[in-house]
A protein has these predicted regions:
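Short hydrophobic beta-strand element within catalytic cores of glycosyltransferases
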Residues: 336-339
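Conserved donor-binding/catalytic core segment of Leloir-type glycosyltransferases
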Residues: 1, 218-237, 243-248, 258-261
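N-terminal subdomain of nucleotide-sugar transferases
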Residues: 1-52, 58-62, 114-115
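Aromatic "clamp/platform" in nucleotide-sugar-dependent glycosyltransferases that forms part
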Residues: 319
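Short alpha-helical donor nucleotide-sugar binding micro-motif in glycosyltransferases
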Residues: 85, 306-311
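Nucleotide-activated donor-binding/catalytic signature segment of Leloir-type glycosyltransferases, i.e.
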Residues: 272-299
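Membrane-proximal helix-turn-helix segments that form the acceptor-binding/catalytic region
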Residues: 127, 143-180, 190, 194, ...
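Conserved acidic donor-binding segment of nucleotide-sugar-dependent glycosyltransferases
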Residues: 351-352, 356-363, 372-378
Length: 415
């Protein structure tokens, strides 16, 4: 049984929910499990978009369960999950992510139902750790002075960080209460080990969205001196650092352009602007960069892939990450890459062999490595080729699903 915070395509269709805009990597893994004859697949989704209460939808050998738990108390949430557990009686309770309260509630429900030994938690991001880096590189002025939009929505930078800290407390309780976690980087292993030194850590790499396995980046087909980033809308994605790097490069590369996918919060102006957006707008104006920035909006998997292939370099300027899927996607396409050396990124990419890693708060280093790629086509090709070879091993679909099932078997046999 899986507990997730976003539906797969199959779940969305069966439960009349909107198509998922995120979590495409979950689709790849769930599809593999649903096609196996030796697996009965149960998918549990807390969502305010479902009908009230608990709903069960059966399709073939799968069961999709939605719970509308909006504004529910902790006790109500735990009771709802307990109801599901006692009806389904799963062999494995696989919780994807620790970022949300429902993960904590499921562990409590499992404890009350005497099923704690069946629980395994996959590490995605670790919000308690992310909170420590949330304001990285943001001047105090913009941290302390909320925008009009922030005041109206009660959504200041400080509140965003405080919310991560609060969720981090539930996260700690979740990790302290489980015997098994699944991770994939030295960073998540270290963070989990600090919280629960006795936990059994199982290694399992992620599988990417299907479309990224079928294409390869080519210099001849890209827009020269173009950079692609996958997100920019909140501080930890480090867009402000990229702007400073581009400012250092624009005179040397007059045709440099940056393409940005995802939410556009950081680019909105006027009363819609966030405090972080105001800082971004200040940098754009200061360095005269507006004509070089191109916002693409939310892209589906195929559109993302095409933008990767059209761009000369992929940059991941985040101030903290575990193992960003966008980096894996760029690697498996064989792109030239520059990424901030934060969190678990160095578990994915080898500096100088598969791309370049740099100190996250040093935009001058980011600018330097971008120029190293722009100026050396052969180096771009060699780094991209090595990155692709590494990513094909890391994101091997058959190997990853086999190892995941082995983890499930080991947990069940241990009991």
């Amino acid at each position: 049984m899986w507990l997730c915070n976003t539906p797969t395509t199959n779940v969305a269709k069966a439960c009349n929910l909107p198509e998922p805009a995120q979590g495409g990597w979950l689709i790849s893994v769930s599809d593999e499990l649903e096609h196996r004859k030796d697996v009965e697949f149960i998918f549990v989704l807390p969502t305010s978009k479902a009908i009230e209460g608990i709903s069960y939808v059966e399709k073939d050998r799968s069961t999709y369960i939605t719970l509308n738990l909006k504004n529910s108390s902790d006790e109500t949430m735990i009771h709802a999950f307990g109801t599901v557990l006692n009806r389904i009686k799963p062999d494995i309770i696989h919780i994807w992510g620790t970022e949300y309260k429902h993960s904590w509630a499921m562990t409590k429900a499992a404890e009350q139902s005497e099923m704690s030994e069946k629980v395994v938690v996959s590490i995605q991001g670790l919000v308690g750790m992310i909170a420590k880096h949330y304001m990285g590189g943001i001047p105090g002025k913009y941290q302390l002075l909320p925008s009009f939009r922030d005041i109206v929505r009660k959504d200041t930078l400080k509140k965003q960080r405080d919310d991560l800290i609060r969720r981090g407390e539930y996260e700690k309780e979740t990790l302290k209460s489980v015997k098994h976690v699944i991770g994939r980087t030295f960073w998540d292993k270290a963070c989990v080990g600090l919280i629960n030194p006795e936990v059994n850590y199982h290694f399992n790499n992620e599988t990417l969205r299907e479309t990224f396995y079928t294409s390869v980046w080519k210099y001849e087909n890209c827009e020269k001196h173009s950079i692609f980033i996958s997100q920019s809308h909140y501080p930890i994605k480090g867009f402000h650092y990229l702007l400073e790097a581009v400012a250092m490069l624009k005179d040397s590369y007059e045709d440099i352009n940056v393409y940005i996918s995802g939410y556009d919060n950081a680019l909105k102006t006027g009363i819609l602007s966030t405090a972080y957006g105001k800082y971004v707008q200040y940098l754009i104006k200061k360095y005269d960069l507006s004509s070089r920035l191109h916002y693409l909006g939310m892209l589906n998997a195929e559109e993302m892939k095409q933008q990767f292939l059209k761009s000369e370099i992929f940059v991941s300027p985040s101030v903290i990450e575990n193992s960003p899927n966008s980096l894996g996607e760029a690697m498996i396409l064989g792109m030239p890459i520059v990424a901030a050396n934060v969190g678990g990124v160095s578990s994915m990419l080898v500096h100088g062999k598969e791309g370049y890693l740099y100190q996250s708060d040093a935009p001058y280093l980011l600018a330097y490595y971008i120029s190293q790629l722009f100026d050396d086509r052969e180096n771009e090709y060699e780094l991209g080729k090595n990155a692709r070879e590494h990513a094909l091993r890391t994101h091997n679909k058959e190997k990853n699903i086999r190892e995941l099932i082995d983890i499930y078997k080991n947990i069940t046999e241990e009991r």
